[in-house]
Every structure is written in structure tokens, then in C-alpha cells.
Amino acid sequence: MKQFIYADNAATTKLNKEAFNAMIPWLTDEYGNASQPYAFARKPKKALAESRKIIAKCINALPEEIYFTSGGTESDNWAIKGSASSDPDKRATITSAIEHHALLNACASIERHGYPVTYLSPDSEGTVDPEQLSAVITDRTRLVSIMFSNNEIGTIEPIAELARIAHSHGAIFHTDAVQAIAHTPIDVKAMGIDMLSASAHKFNGPKGVGFLYIRKGVELRPLNDGGAQEFGMRAGTENVASIVGMAKALEISCSALNENAEHILKLENALLERLKESGLDFVRNGARNHIPGNISVSFKDADGGQFFIVWT
């Protein structure tokens, strides 16, 4: 039997074995509620603190700027809705037309509540032009949200320049980095990122857990009501096992980021060579500056059966 090759790692990734093993104690013996004041909660509470440090280090943030969530969708919704409701004098949001539906639908939601949203159109390679942002942003803009890398074609956006323009008008800058984190270097301080969304299952962590980086000083309202978890900003008992697994997976990926990128680019080039040799008429989509391994191609006048030629 031939080895199975999963070719949709932009949709999800396999759970890292080390991350899985790191989760086990928190699912078995150390199952205490980290929010409680007694001794049995101390180890889970410490595990959350250590996980925050690990994640923060990967993106050059402070541990107290990391807020655990259920994943990228919640993080995006929190960034959009929490920002829209926090300052009535700055109501406008600017985003792009190629964002993930988690963010686009969150924007549609605030539009229904009277908050204006402007959608920027990228160029043919999926790049959002900073000059286009400069042309539409005003001092009434509260938030600019542009994804770090597109999940369909892999294009990496000019994040630092877009953030600079946002800040020049007093706006905060959010990026959905779900597809980018652990695959390309991210420095939230150097890039001027105020908020960043991430999801563990995109970097070999468990599903159902993620985080939102919120720069110290950014005003954001809680998305849900309940207990005082996550510094009083995100109610709900913390999923300690998954958070620990996420931190371990991110630590492993970030420590080998350059090595992994080099390996994946070799595989990417090998696949493209194979496609050229197949005789299929195709074009590569996206920009030269893209996430390693994210390959988008369009085929001319080809039916599904022809694609098997590539692998035989």
C-alpha cells in the first residue's frame, strides 16, 4: 500500500506527537479547574502561565497580551465586534474582500448594527495595495483588519506598511494570521500589529483552541459574558490540555521555522516541476512572496482524469 499523502494542510494539520503527549496529564491526573483558589488548581494555573510565555515568545509579545480562545473564528469575531463597540466616535472598519469567512461574516454582522465597513480589493496576485488603504482611511476609522497570508493562494500581505498607515490615522491594526503563524516569521512589535488571531490546528496543534494577541493598551470589549477568566476578558473554564498542546506545537514549529520552510519549498518546487513535465497547461496563482507550501494553480482545458498523469 502506498503511503498516504495529505495535501490540504491549509485546512488542518496532523497533531504533533509531542503536543499530544504534553496534553495527556491535563486530561487524566491533573484535571483541576485553573480558575479555582485551592491547591489542586495550582498546576493547571501554572501550565496556562507557561503556555502564555511560550506563545508570546514566538511572536515577540508579552505573556499578558495572549488571550486563549476556541480558535481562529472566535478570535476574528472578538477582534471585529469588540473593536466596533468600544469607541462610538470611531465607528469605521476597513478590511479586504479576500478575508476568511470568519472575518467577513463578523464584518457583515457589525454592518447590520450600523457600523460602516469598507472592503479593499486586492490585485491579481492577491496583494492589498497600501496606497488603496491610504485612499480610503480617515480619522474616523477604528480598525483596519488585513489577513497576514491568504489561505487560498498563500500571498503574504505588506503587514508592516498597512499597520503604519492605520496608526497614522489613529486606527488599530488586526491581522488574521491563522494561515501564517509558525510558517513565516512574525514579530508583532516590529510589524506594528495590535491584534493577531491564531488557531492551533493550523500548526500541528489540537482543534478547538487558539488565541488572540491584544497589544497592551488596546481597548477591546469582551465577546461573551460569564466568569473572570483570561484577565476578565474571555469568560469560560480554560481548556488546559488543549492550550498546553497548542503551546508545545507552536514551540516546536517556531524553533524549526526556517528549516521547515526550506524543506517545504523543495517539495513545492518538486511538485511544480512534476506538473510541468506532465504536459498540462497551467498557471501559478498568487505572489512570489507567499507562505511555503501553499500552491494554487489553474489548469486550462483539463478534465479531472488528466491530473492522475502527474502521479503515475
Where are these regions (language model features)?
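Pyridoxal 5′-phosphate
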Residues: M1-T312
